[in-house]
């Protein structure tokens, strides 16, 4: 189970000492990540954390609107300085191949980058995640020194905890040794690979919950899981809970059906790897 600790908006869903904008101090007044971690681990399930904070840098764009608080100093510690896209720098959403080759600098300032690292370290120390998953935004080569510090911190902590952990990122953020993630099944490798990878796939036609969300059938999801495993990959299935945290019944039913299939066929899934052919 891999909840999002912080999405692009910059609001932490955990008890953070590095920002006042967190779920423990506002809104539900709960450490949502901590509570979920305890519940998941009580069931003997691995627990990971997803962090999208790097994309917060240019999530809030300047606007001509007059009735908003984007420029209010009271909220500067939440929004940060509004950013305009800079065509001369690698995008925070991920540089092009040409930008990587040219070694253009990251658009974020050093203060933001150090804060990003500190928040990652806070999440690592508080929740000891079995997997640390990152969305877009960290695959610029200019961020390699920072990412090296993060990986060293995480792996050294894991050695102290005496347990294996994994990093998962999109594109070639870490080049080798981590789990490459592909967003949606259509981007998955078509052949057996030498490296391990996974697909993050929504249970419906959207990642977040909306009224009338179109849900995939359990057979569709199982087919994608088996396809991926046969090619040395995995499937990270995104669930879309409502605003109150409840999982709609139609999603629950699909999960139960997948669970029933796994009870029968799990031996061919867990602890296995790709063979010489796939299909």
Language-model regions, residue ranges each:
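Mature catalytic domains of secreted/periplasmic carbohydrate-active enzymes
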Residues: 1-279
